[in-house]
Amino acid sequence: MAKEKFERTKEHVNVGTIGHVDHGKSTLTSAITCVLAAGLVEGGKAKCFKYEEIDKAPEEKERGITINITHVEYETAKRHYAHVDCPGHADYIKNMITGAAQMDGAILVVSAADGPMPQTREHVLLARQVNVPYIVVFMNKCDMVDDEELLELVELEVRELLSKYEYPGDEVPVIRGSALGALQELEQNSPGKWVGSIKELLNAMDEYIPTPEREVDKPFLMPIEDVFSISGRGTVVTGRVERGVLRPGDEVEIVGLREEPLKTVATSIEMFRKVLDEALPGDNIGVLLRGVGKDDVERGQVLAQPGSVKAHRKFRAQVYVLSKEEGGRHTPFFVNYRPQFYFRTADVTGTVVKLPEGVEMVMPGDNVELEVELIAPVALEEGLRFAIREGGRTVGAGVVTKILD
């Protein structure tokens, strides 16, 4: 059977389910796809995934870390959604920190029978740390709770929890429903109130989660992978465009690894030996730079729109430390630990200068906030992902949560 062409007519938004173990994240993911597949939402489209298909998530590797993660896609009349679901708690932490699947918005699933639990809090905290901008709440298992007052109480608790982590707890949509109830209604061919709750959730996602700014509309940035000298023409840098657009004649800055950025002009752009009149995100290109010597530029710097990104040495980060079983360290590390930090194409030694209060050491398998000082400045911004390596192996992954210099 021929594959359907990916239609770019609808806005694209990345979402994912988060929340405590057994509160029904995978069941909800299944219910969303099956309600849409049943044609019960006008303009909606999906392939129905059973719970088992979502729960046995395939393994993926991101920055040297193995994560179990399921990707599904579906459409409402307004949008195309890419949706991620992770079976295990550790998988969520790893996914959110490595950015294996970035989220424009998250669906926080809370069991009405239990209310917010420890992992509910941890996921909301992480969502805040790694900049998931919007959260929509699905209060699941409402078919198991007869007491209206209990539902009110759980909703209040969830709103307070969101406010505590700087989400607008009073404005966040909270949908009361039952994912399993919706699947049962579909099975009995009698869509009712629980299928209605899934439709309500989709509507809340469409209305409440804004469409993210497209990569192509952001300021241009390309991590430099390689530098060549072409006799008679000058210096060429190669790399893959991360965001924005570059056209011949554009002014650019070379940022990182040196104290000051270097201004230059992109005189010509090539891809697969053909000259390009514009480079877009994802393009692997070579850029000829005006008046730049081969020694003025190196791998690990970035080529960027002037003024759009600065180089920094000090930052705070949320880090996941690989366990011994994942090929990580076998022993803890302490303040003054000095591994290599990999940002895009840059590989720079840094020192862990601060751990959270009361934390003396970090064990393999931990998820921790720490402060780092690099020996050379790197083009950094909040939300940037990195890997931590020592002796050629990955021992951790992190995300920059705050620039400190």
From Swiss-Prot:
SUPFAM superfamilies per UniProt: EF-Tu/eEF-1alpha/eIF2-gamma C-terminal domain, P-loop containing nucleoside triphosphate hydrolases, Translation proteins
Q: Where is this region: G4?
A: 140-143
Q: Where in the cell is it found?
A: Cytoplasm
Gene Ontology cellular component terms for the protein in this record: cytosol
Chain's role: GTP hydrolase that promotes the GTP-dependent binding of aminoacyl-tRNA to the A-site of ribosomes during protein biosynthesis.
InterPro entries found in the cross-reference section? EF-Tu_GTP-bd (IPR041709), EF-Tu_GTPase (IPR050055), EFTu-like_2 (IPR004161), EFTU_2 (IPR033720), G_TR_CS (IPR031157), P-loop_NTPase (IPR027417), Small_GTP-bd (IPR005225), T_Tr_GTP-bd_dom (IPR000795)
**What protein does this entry describe?**
Elongation factor Tu
* Ranges where the record places region G1: 19-26
